[in-house]
UniProtKB/Swiss-Prot annotation:
Residues annotated as domain Toprim: 81-177
Signal peptide, first to last residue: none
NCBIfam families: recR
One Pfam family recorded for the sequence: RecR_C
GO molecular function list: DNA binding; zinc ion binding
Full protein name: Recombination protein RecR
Disulfide bonds: none
Organism from which the protein derives: Orientia tsutsugamushi (strain Boryong) (Rickettsia tsutsugamushi)
One biological process term in Gene Ontology: DNA repair
Length: 203
């Protein structure tokens, strides 16, 4: 195989590693870029370089922004008495698109499983969450983890971690099917889940 072919195959392989893409979709993307490579590839390269150099994780919640405190955490009209705990930035963005939540967020970054060790637990940044709860006198925590086994396990771990705090802890309820992920739910389903959220005592 020619060297140029190897380069293209490596690019296809890289795209195929992205969530939601397989080899067929990756090939289509590469062929699309190659149809006008001087413009399309240069534009993509510039955009990726800009993201690499400018986008960072919010010091407070874990969202992505061009500054260390994201627009949501800076917004004076957000309800600082309530924090929704989500698994990923994708879930945070899904809730923002739905416009069903006007409080703050905490992005866990991952979930726990039955074999998770201390490194996985520490990566959830729960001490940072606890400091924020105490500093801003947060009154309610909404567990907006996905309805998967790992999501449920993570939710129960967070409940146990915060059990000594004077907090209302609730969890998204009806409308989210077992195994469902927030990023794939429509606005009506998310709204129903927020309105029908349950106290952790009922879980």
């Amino acid at each position: 195989m020619h060297k140029d072919s190897n380069i293209i195959e490596e690019l296809i392989f890289s795209f195929a590693q992205l969530p939601g893409l397989g080899n067929r979709s990756a090939r289509r993307i590469v062929l699309y870029l190659m149809q006008d490579k001087e413009v399309r590839i240069k534009n993509l390269n510039n955009q990726l370089t800009s993201v690499l150099n400018n986008i960072m994780e919010c010091d407070y919640c874990g969202n992505l922004d061009v500054v260390s405190i994201c627009n949501i955490c800076r917004h004076s009209e957000r309800d600082s008495s309530i924090i929704a705990i989500v698994e990923s930035v994708a879930d945070l963005w899904a809730l923002e698109r739905s416009k069903v939540f006007k409080g703050w967020y905490h992005v866990l970054g991952k979930t726990l499983s039955a074999v998770s060790g201390n490194d996985a637990i520490n990566s959830l940044k729960l001490p940072k969450l606890l400091n924020r709860i105490r500093e801003y006198k947060v009154q309610e925590i909404i567990l907006a983890t996905n309805s998967t086994i790992d999501g449920q396990m993570t939710a129960f771990f967070v409940i146990d971690y915060l059990k000594d705090e004077n907090l209302k802890i609730s969890k998204l309820a009806s409308g989210i099917p077992l195994g469902g992920e927030l990023d794939y739910l429509d606005e009506g389903t998310l709204l129903a889940a927020f309105k029908a959220r349950q106290s952790h005592d009922l879980l």
